[in-house]
Amino acid sequence: MVQTAWDADPDARPVLRWLVTVRRAGAMTPAALMVACHLRWVADDMRAGADGRFPVVVEQSAVFLPEPPAGEVAWWVTTGHAARLVQAGLGLRLDVVDDAWLAGLPHELTDRRIRTGVLEELVAWPAQTPGFVKPSLAKVDVLAAQWVPDIAVAARLALDAGAHPATSVQVSDVRLDLVAEHRVYVLDGRAVASSPYLVDGASWEPGWDAASRPTETSAARAFAEAAVASGPSPEALVVDVGLLASGRWVVVEANAPWASNPYGCDLRLVVDCVVAASCGRPASRWTWSADAHEAAIASTMDPLVAR
C-alpha cells in the first residue's frame, strides 16, 4: 500500500419518572426510548427489547417526531435521521466508535492495515491501487462498502455521483476471505449478545441466533471482548467479527448500538446496549457528530421536528 498523509501519526486517532436500573447498579433508565426510523421491524424489535421497562416512542414517517418526554431519553435512530434531528436543534448526545478505533487495533486482531481519512484524499492515490473502501459510519448510497480495483477511480466516481468530499472513509489493503460473520454487542467490556449474520455467503434469516452455531458464538464473543480490551472503547458498542477460511478470527468493523441491526441477538440485552450508548452520555472522544455527507443531505431536507 502506498504511504499517505494518514500514515504520519497512526495513533492520532409518553412520560415516566426515573425507574429502577435497566442493566446493573447505577445504570440509567430512560424516560423513553425514541425510535426514529421508517422500518417497522426496528420499532418491533425495540419494543420487544424494552419489555415494558419504559415507553418506546416510534416515528416512522421521517417527517415529524413526537415531543420527547421530560428527562433523559434513549435513541434508536439511523445516522441520517440523527443528522436531521441535529439540524432541528435537538442536542443529541450519542456514543459511537470513532474512525481511529478500528485502525488502531493491533494487526493480529484485524489481519490487515486500515487507514482513515476523507473521500477527496483518495483521488490522489496512485493509479490501479486496489483496496477495500467503505464509509466510516455514514450510509452513502453512491459509495458502497466493497473491494475496488482502483481506489482513486472509485473515489472519483463517488464524488461525481454526489458524495461529499469530506465523507469519512476507511481503506484496507486485504480482501478478507470470511466463511462466517457474527455481530457482537459489548457492554462494559463484556459480550452480552450476539448473532451470526453471514454464513458461507448466505445472509441472516429468521432463526439464526446465538444458539445456531454455539462453538462459533463462544469464540466470536471471546474475540470481540479481546478487541475491546486492547485499548480505549466506548461503554457500549457493536463489534462485527469474522471467521477466516484459515480458522482465525478478525475484527470486521465496529458500529453504534443505537443504529445497528440486531439480527438474532437477545433483544432485551440489545436495548440495554442502546440505552448505554444513547442516554445521558457525557461529552467524550466517543461523542457522535454527523458525517459531512449526511449533514449535507440533512441541510437540504426539512428537519425532523416535534409535532
Where are the regions a protein language model picked out?
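C-terminal appended segment following the main domain
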Residues: 255-307
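Active-site nucleotide/adenylate-binding loops and adjacent lid/helix of ATP-dependent enzymes
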Residues: 2-3, 7-9, 18-30, 39-226
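Residues at beta-strand starts and edge strands
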Residues: 14, 180, 235-237
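A long amphipathic alpha-helix within ATP-dependent nucleotide-binding catalytic cores
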Residues: 198-248, 273, 278, 295-306
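Conserved metal-phosphate-binding beta-hairpin within the catalytic cores
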Residues: 192, 233-264
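Short, low-complexity, intrinsically disordered N-terminal peptides in bacterial proteins
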Residues: 1-14, 299-307
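Nuclease-adjacent, charged terminal/linker segments that flank catalytic cores
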Residues: 35-36
